[in-house]
């Protein structure tokens, strides 16, 4: 999965009495969850988190290292934090390249890899003494510190990945699949819902593989046995009564069993499946599962069972050796699959990826041309599919209310990566509200609507 790059210098909302730690979180939602866990532990120990380098006694930078632009952003951010503060701890995916970080930034206080929560806290203790605080007064909310808006949250169900995609280095950074106990996942989900969360976004490196590493062993939740398996997890999450959105789903056969849950309204009819390509030879070079014919058959079957199903995917153009004919096969796949939401990236030779050694690399000029052609085809598909939504009514979750009106999302839209629903400012609403909207206009990405009575 291509990581979404974003930076957040955060303020946990803590009191202003304790020792202050600055924090910068870079990268994808999985990294954001790591940041939330570190921040929660800091707050539990009485540290304050500040959004100013100047006020902090040290700064933690949680890095991304998936693609070259992410590496550069991480290195630049470390440099900025050093220049502004002077005391910096580095963690996250880029932390596995400790020598590279120290060579460029020798003054960092310490470097750790991803999900190294205890090591990060130990390094903080080494440089900033634990503040005196009363844990019964300075309470951390049961759901922990969250960096997302209060009405939605990411629910990470596992770490690592057992795949060895040739364009990816995630397993070398985050290790093999390590599924969280299903009871722990469901407990976190309940705490989040109890705190007011209206949407849970299930994330991992490979959501479909949840529980494979522990042979789908039985755990317990609320006194009842539950298998560590994607299907059983979805069935239990559905009982929370909030939107459940699935991300990073590989098209394994058992995904077919999730579609009826969507058709029954138990979880959102939304699947994020990173197909990456359609040509059989390219998929084999990528070490990716699937073939276009089989995928198209399954998509048709899914839509027959659940007509409202929305499918998001990501693709790579310009993979080493990709011919014009193979790229055109990808375009034909787009036309046949009629996917709802699509992202596309030019192949990036990530340091350490085995695909870099493949012959016949595609020039950047050709990659850019293919990217533009790909996006033009998908823009037309997306526009046509959204035009069909005009006149229909949807429940939306309000994300923002500003001077121009209300900004929300329907079940078709995940935060940050998909489209939005815009309404005029004639309605009384606040973030986290759920309201019914009739769509009156659409382009290739977003829709506009008017409120209707519940």
From Swiss-Prot:
GO process terms (BP): tRNA modification
Binding-site residues, [4Fe-4S] cluster 2: 161, 165, 168
Which residues span the membrane? none
Task: Tell me the cofactors it needs.
Answer: [4Fe-4S] cluster
What terms describe the molecular function in GO for this protein?
A: 4 iron, 4 sulfur cluster binding; aspartic acid methylthiotransferase activity; metal ion binding; protein methylthiotransferase activity
Q: Where in the cell is it found?
A: Cytoplasm
| UniProt domain MTTase N-terminal: residue ranges | 19-129
Cofactor stoichiometry and binding remark: Binds 2 [4Fe-4S] clusters. One cluster is coordinated with 3 cysteines and an exchangeable S-adenosyl-L-methionine.
Q: Can you name a GO cellular component term? A: cytosol
Keyword Nucleotide-binding carried by entry: no
Offer one Pfam family short name for this entry: UPF0004
Which amino acids does the record list as binding [4Fe-4S] cluster 1? 28, 64, 93
Going by the record, the broad EC class of this enzyme is: transferase
Give the PANTHER family listed for this entry.
RIBOSOMAL PROTEIN S12 METHYLTHIOTRANSFERASE RIMO, RIBOSOMAL PROTEIN US12 METHYLTHIOTRANSFERASE RIMO
Summary of the function given for this chain in its UniProt record: Catalyzes the methylthiolation of an aspartic acid residue of ribosomal protein uS12.
Q: What is this protein called?
A: Ribosomal protein uS12 methylthiotransferase RimO
Q: What is the lineage of its organism?
A: Bacteria, Pseudomonadati, Pseudomonadota, Gammaproteobacteria, Alteromonadales
Gene that encodes the chain: rimO
């Amino acid at each position: 999965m291509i990581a979404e790059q974003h930076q957040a210098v955060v303020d946990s909302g803590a009191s202003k009495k304790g020792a202050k730690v600055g924090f910068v979180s870079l990268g994808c939602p999985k990294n954001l969850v790591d940041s939330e866990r570190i921040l929660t532990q800091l707050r539990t120990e009485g540290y304050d988190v500040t959004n100013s380098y100047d006020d902090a006694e040290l700064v933690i930078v949680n890095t991304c290292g998936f693609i070259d632009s992410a590496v550069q952003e991480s290195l630049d951010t470390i440099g900025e934090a050093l220049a502004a503060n002077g005391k910096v701890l580095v963690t996250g995916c880029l932390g596995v390249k400790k020598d590279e970080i120290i060579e460029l930034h020798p003054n960092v206080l310490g470097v750790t890899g991803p999900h190294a929560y205890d090591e990060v806290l130990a390094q903080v203790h080494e440089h900033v003494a634990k503040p005196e605080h009363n844990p019964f007064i300075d309470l951390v909310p049961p759901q922990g510190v969250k960096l997302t808006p209060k009405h939605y949250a990411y629910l990470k169900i596992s770490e690592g990945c057992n795949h060895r995609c040739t364009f990816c280095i995630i397993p070398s950074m985050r290790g093999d699949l390590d599924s969280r106990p299903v009871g722990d996942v469901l407990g976190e989900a309940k705490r989040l819902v109890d705190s007011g969360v209206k949407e849970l976004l299930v994330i991992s490196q490979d959501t479909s593989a949840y529980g494979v590493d522990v042979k789908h062993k039985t755990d317990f939740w609320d006194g009842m046995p539950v298998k560590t398996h994607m299907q059983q997890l979805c069935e239990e999450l559905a009982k929370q009564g909030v939107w459940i959105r699935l991300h990073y789903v590989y098209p394994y056969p058992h995904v077919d069993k999730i579609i009826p849950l969507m058709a029954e309204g138990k979880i959102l009819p939304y699947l994020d499946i990173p197909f990456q390509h359609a040509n059989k030879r390219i998929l084999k070079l990528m070490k990716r599962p699937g073939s276009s014919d089989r995928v198209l058959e399954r998509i048709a079957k899914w839509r027959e069972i659940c007509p409202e199903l929305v499918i998001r995917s990501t693709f790579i153009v310009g993979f080493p050796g990709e011919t014009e004919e193979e790229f055109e096969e990808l375009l034909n796949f787009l036309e046949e699959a009629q996917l709802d939401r699509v992202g596309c990236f030019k192949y990036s030779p990530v340091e350490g990826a085995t695909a870099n050694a493949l012959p016949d690399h595609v020039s950047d000029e050709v990659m850019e041309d293919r990217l533009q052609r790909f996006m033009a085809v998908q823009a037309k598909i997306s526009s046509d599919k959204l035009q069909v939504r005009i006149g229909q009514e949807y429940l939306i979750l309000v994300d923002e209310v500003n001077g121009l009106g209300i900004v929300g999302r329907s079940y078709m839209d995940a935060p940050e990566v998909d489209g939005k629903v815009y309404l005029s400012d004639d309605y009384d609403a606040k973030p986290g509200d759920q309201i019914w909207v009739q769509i009156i206009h659409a382009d290739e990405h977003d829709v506009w609507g008017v409120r209707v009575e519940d």
